[in-house]
Design a protein with these regions (language model features):
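Conserved mid-core alpha-helix of short-chain dehydrogenase/reductase
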Residues: 5, 47-51, 157, 162-165, ...
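Hydrophobic pocket-lining residues that define ligand/cofactor binding sites across diverse proteins
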Residues: 52, 106, 139, 170-171
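Glycine/proline-rich active-site loop of Rossmann-fold NAD(P)-dependent oxidoreductases
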Residues: 96, 114, 121-134, 141-143, ...
């Protein structure tokens, strides 16, 4: 979130497109201490937006999360790009705020942007604090599997390479100022 470093990077390289994936993402950490989430997810995004505007990039793609929409349980209607935001924790609130900054730069300064809200990624080298690695490691170690709440929350899972393909398609063919909901229709409750 250091604007000087961001500016220098834009200055030294001929950057024409930004795909913004940088974020603090672990919900539990955001509940314990939200400061890093404010710095990285909100101020970090703001600094990238300022540099993107200054250096007149051709496209700014912001990768966000479906967590900004709240949560789903069995029988609930699926999220869509028109679903109102309903963040339920400091992490999702910080991502919702960064989404709003991107949209504000688009409408105020005409920054060419696209935005995607993606479901839960899984795949190689996933951080050990994420849900699937925690469950797998708990099983391997003979530990109790942690379940949040009653385990009824629904998560859609997407393989990381499929998410990357979606980002590329949005970056190259997406319509400016549009939001794209990225998922795989692989919905499971935490208990499943």
């Amino acid at each position: 979130s250091d604007y000087g470093k961001v500016y220098d990077t834009f200055y030294k390289h001929d950057i024409t497109h930004v795909v913004h994936l940088a974020a603090e993402t672990h919900v539990d950490n955001s509940i314990l201490d939200a400061d890093a989430f404010l710095r990285t997810n909100i101020m970090g995004t703001h600094n990238l937006l300022k540099a993107a505007l200054k250096f007149e990039i051709r496209r700014f793609h912001h990768v966000s999360t479906d967590e900004v929409y709240g949560h789903l349980e069995k029988g609930d209607k699926k999220f869509s790009e028109e679903t109102p935001y309903d963040p339920r924790n400091p992490y999702s609130a910080s991502k919702a705020a960064s989404d709003m900054f991107v949209r504000a730069y688009g409408s105020t300064f005409k920054l060419p942007f696209t935005l995607s809200n993606c479901s839960n990624n899984y795949g190689p080298k996933q951080h050990k604090e994420k849900f699937l690695p925690v469950v797998i490691n708990s099983i391997l170690n003979g530990d109790k599997i942690p379940i949040y709440g009653k385990g009824a929350n629904i998560r859609d899972w997407i393989y990381v390479e499929d998410h990357c393909s979606a980002i590329w398609k949005i970056l190259t063919k997406g319509k400016y100022a549009e939001t794209y909901l990225v998922g795989s229709n692989c919905e499971k409750t935490n208990l499943e």
